[in-house]
Design a protein with these regions (language model features):
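A Zn2+-metalloprotease active-site environment signal
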Residues: 1-220
Length: 221
């Protein structure tokens, strides 16, 4: 996967070695996944972003570092991606999407590819929203343990939204095909939770002090 991305999309990072090392040292403080690997790349057409590959590798793009106001905001995104890696979200989504697609293709038969693909897309979208929300809360816990306000991740989501890298709030207010009101319609079809919902959840966590271990964290330990 990384080789293919490097060949077709990503570029070598333009960040200086000292800058990369400083971010890498802070990344390692997020723990506890000692096997997590952080790589730096130029994003090309991906723009400001970070990626967690199915093998646990995390790729931080130069454009995201440039977009952030401070390193705490970068750490917020890295904590989110580390959560995906620790929980095997990338591999889980890959397995479930291919398994669901294969079953529906068998069930529908060759005569109806639309029936085979559309339900799989909806099922995977619902699952992806759950994983994104879970990763946000795990990231908030990691940041709080480092003494970083989880609101830094919320701030970064706002920046990404402004650049068009995250679902916009305007899209949440569109009209459904049935003419119904609309926030829930677009949120249901989205592959991620709405940016506003994610920001609100992170700031609610921050407002509670964010230092108490959640039930999900306790269950993982």
């Amino acid at each position: 996967t990384l080789s293919l991305l490097d060949q077709r999309i990503l570029k070598p990072s333009a960040l200086r070695a000292a800058r990369q090392q400083a971010l890498l040292e802070r990344f390692r403080q997020l723990g506890p996944d000692r096997g997590a690997r952080l790589l730096f790349r130029g994003g090309g057409r991906l723009g400001a972003n970070a990626l967690a590959l199915p093998d646990g590798t995390i790729i931080l793009l130069d454009e995201l570092v440039d977009l952030a106001d401070n390193d705490d905001q970068v750490l917020g995104v890295l904590a989110h991606e580390m959560a995906h890696a620790e929980q095997n979200h990338g591999l889980q989504a890959l397995i479930e999407s291919t398994a669901v697609g294969a079953f529906l293709a068998w069930w529908a038969g060759d005569f109806s590819p639309l029936i085979a693909t559309a339900p799989a897309a909806l099922l995977q979208a619902r699952h992806s929203r759950k994983l994104e929300s879970e990763a946000d809360m795990i990231a908030a816990e990691k940041l709080a343990r480092m003494g970083i306000d989880p609101a830094r991740l919320a701030e970064m989501l706002e920046k990404l939204e402004a650049q068009g890298a995250a679902p916009s709030e305007n899209s949440e207010r569109e009209t459904s095909p049935a003419g119904e009101s609309t926030e829930k319609w677009s949120d249901f079809l989205s592959s991620h939770p709405s940016t506003r919902a994610r920001r609100d959840a992170l700031r609610e966590f921050s407002g509670r002090g964010g230092m108490q271990t959640s039930d999900s964290e306790a269950n993982r330990e």
